Amino acid sequence: MIDKTAFIHPTAIVEEGAVIGANAHIGPFCIVGPDVKIGEGTVLKSHVVVNGHTTIGRDNEIYQFASIGEVNQDLKYAGEPTRVEIGDRNRIRESVTIHRGTAQGGGLTKVGSDNLLMINAHVAHDCTVGNRCILANNATLAGHVSVDDFAIIGGMTAVHQFCIIGAHVMVGGCSGVAQDVPPYVIAQGNHATPFGVNIEGLKRRGFSKEALHAIRNAYKLLYRSGKTLDEVKPEIAEIAAKHPEVQPFYDFFARSTRGLIR
């Protein structure tokens, strides 16, 4: 179903069964598959391919040669009807690739809202990208990676399968991330190691001086005290009890499956 207010360029191919919302714009030479839903006001600039069971929300801008919802690169994939879901107000730049999930990995690749995916960024099968994240040019997420809200992944950076990038993290360019990065941390290098707290990013997002001080103290306990994770957990829990901004930092320890960067 194509809304009567949507624009479809004469050279675009929109297959029967696709749903195109009000005021959406499908530009020249785009291809939209039969199981695709595109929300109100979303713009496909030109030469964009959207395939598979893919749902895209409203007011997104998707630039030329982006490929969304195509078959993933997992050799176990056998054609199952897995999905891609994309939220609202994302900017997906040239040649970005977002692959559908796998049956073994939950069947869903998900991108939230208000993200910027720069040129050539790759989001592999079963990844989850939160809200207000930035993947810079050529940033690559392997399968099953989670990127939490407000995280920034620098250009040419690769993230290993199943890694978790915490909220408000900044990973510097040309890095290789092979373990989980706790919230608020700056990481850099191959393999990525911690370089402090993302103070400037947190200031821009309105964190108070007291919260920043508490987060720094938690960071120092984890990375500068010389103690094991089990030893510092109770101390960080005490800080989190007084400063709720530290709670996500503490909770991340239980989420981690690949171990924390060191």
Curated annotation (Swiss-Prot):
Disulfide bonds: none annotated. GO terms for molecular function: acyl-[acyl-carrier-protein]-UDP-N-acetylglucosamine O-acyltransferase activity. Its EC number is 2.3.1.129. It catalyses: a (3R)-hydroxyacyl-[ACP] + UDP-N-acetyl-alpha-D-glucosamine = a UDP-3-O-[(3R)-3-hydroxyacyl]-N-acetyl-alpha-D-glucosamine + holo-[ACP]. One of its GO terms (biological process) is lipid A biosynthetic process. GO terms for cellular component: cytoplasm; membrane. InterPro entries: Acetyltransf_C (IPR029098), Acetyltransf_C_sf (IPR037157), Hexapep (IPR001451), Hexapep_transf_CS (IPR018357), Lipid_A_LpxA (IPR010137), Trimer_LpxA-like_sf (IPR011004). It comes from the Bacteria. Keywords: Acyltransferase, Cytoplasm, Lipid A biosynthesis, Lipid biosynthesis, Lipid metabolism, Repeat, Transferase. CDD domains: LbH_UDP-GlcNAc_AT (cd03351). It is an enzyme of class 2 (transferase). It is found in: Cytoplasm. Its main location: cytoplasm. Pathway: Glycolipid biosynthesis; lipid IV(A) biosynthesis; lipid IV(A) from (3R)-3-hydroxytetradecanoyl-[acyl-carrier-protein] and UDP-N-acetyl-alpha-D-glucosamine: step 1/6. Homotrimer. Belongs to the transferase hexapeptide repeat family. LpxA subfamily. Involved in the biosynthesis of lipid A, a phosphorylated glycolipid that anchors the lipopolysaccharide to the outer membrane of the cell. This is Acyl-[acyl-carrier-protein]--UDP-N-acetylglucosamine O-acyltransferase. It comes from Cronobacter sakazakii (strain ATCC BAA-894).
